[in-house]
Amino acid sequence: MQSSSFIPSLAIAALCAACASSKLDLPAAAPKPDPRVGLRAAWMNAAEAAWNVRLVSTTPPSEQFIDHSNPGNYEFINSDLAFVGNYVIQGNFHGFQVWDLSRPSRPTLVTAYVCPGSQNDVSVYHNLLFASGEAPNGRIDCSTQGVPDTVSKDRLRGIRIFDISDIAHPKNVANVQTCRGSHTHTVVTDPNDTANVYIYVSGSAPVRSPNELVGCSALMPDQDPNSELFRIEVIQVSLAHPEQAHVLGKPAILAGLTARQSHAEAPEDIAAAAKAAAEARAKGGFTATVHGAEIVLGPGFVGRQLDSIVKARQGTGAPTGVDSAALRTALQGIVDKIVNPPSGPGGVRPGPTQCHDITVYPAIGLAGGACGGYGLLLDIHNVADPRRIAAVADSNFAFWHSATFNNDGSKVLFTDEWGGGLQARCRPTDKPEWGADAIFTVAHDTMTFQSYYKLPAPQTQFENCVAHNGSLIPIPGRDIMVQGWYQGGISVFDWTDPAHPTEIAYFDRGPMDSTKLVGAGSWSAYWYNGYIVSSEIARGLDVFELVPSGFISQNEIDAAKLVHFE
């Protein structure tokens, strides 16, 4: 739901003339030592630490969305959130769950809709629910057997559209296929077009075969002007006839950018990767070099490549030793094509070929694009044809992941998902500007860097932790944000002064396991109608409320609760 991370401009300041009146009577200093350090590990009953927030409820996943025997099962990762009325829709790599939040202290399950295919990033507009599909196992019919064939008419990569007029019984009314699938998407409204909504699709998968989806091309633009590279898709959805949704255009918002260097991995990660690669090779595993480090390739990726080799020789059955040898010979080239696009004219390495996520602010005609190697500022006054007006890069950023505007659009915050989200990147040895937020001021089509913000509490090597999704809290006259940091928990911070962001509240749990990294933590934390709602990857759904402190008064909290979304 990153597209909804902005708070619409509302005239609420006048309702809160005394907002700051009581906070000075309460302590403002954070507890020392930090209670987040050294928390006891466990799955459902890990030790907890909270400061200036109260945990209202924790609701475990429904039975269809949990593997009791394997808490780290990636097939059941809880992902992003979307809201409508009293309901929250929680995406999951296995589908989505709808929870009734009428009683925040006890959310109740409305429906568990099984539909495998990551990430199931979700958004809602009135009675329509949109879900992103990118994984090769996603099927049009949402069944669970996957798609074993390399090319298949049964595969879904793109956007699923559901009618949730009866929210207990979502009805799939349309699927829009795209060439790179949909890792995330953003719903955009056009003030001049009330008959339609638009979806900006960010796909990060390799380009599909044209044998599976006609017209898909992975060639560079100088070889094929209709290349899918360096573009996003814009889908138009008729509100009266969503079944007619279609790709309207493919603006090349990344064209013309050149590759930028990022920092190397941390020394301990380089050493660990080398050790793991050596062990894998000794056991017959498959490895490849990515950004200077040898990595072990997963069985799913290897299996798909071997299947392709078998089919290319018109064979059947299991891959042979000859097939494995052929893959070893070709593997580095295959990985290079995925990770490093070929050089453009003149041998210049191009910049990123896709965006990860786009956050829109239609009221001011701007969007923030987080696009791997760059952060973009987009002009979206013409919603159907967004245009890049500024781009920033930073060698401290490994992967530009998401963006959040402040309320008046004078600032934008970008996150860096260094390590991809399932690695420990908040260790005491990790630099504070790596895997952090970068805050920029915005003026006259220019973004100017101001500072970094990173979760200040060090986490263990067994906790995946890095900057992830969050939203503004609508406190008048201030820029306050809540953000998920995976197993770093949630952090609430004040970035009203963009050069000096300050943490003012937090919640954290101990790791899932005290001996190894098991993925978990807050995928996203959003303010919604007076509460903070967090999607916990492995533990379910958390609901919090702010408590008055030396940083936020009760009057300010009450003013924020006056902002109500439907």
Q: Each PLM stretch: what is its role?
A:
Residues 1-5:
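Positively charged n-region of N-terminal signal peptides that target proteins for export
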Residues 8-18:
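Bacterial N-terminal signal peptides
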Residues 19-566:
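Feature marking well-ordered beta-strand scaffolds used for ligand recognition
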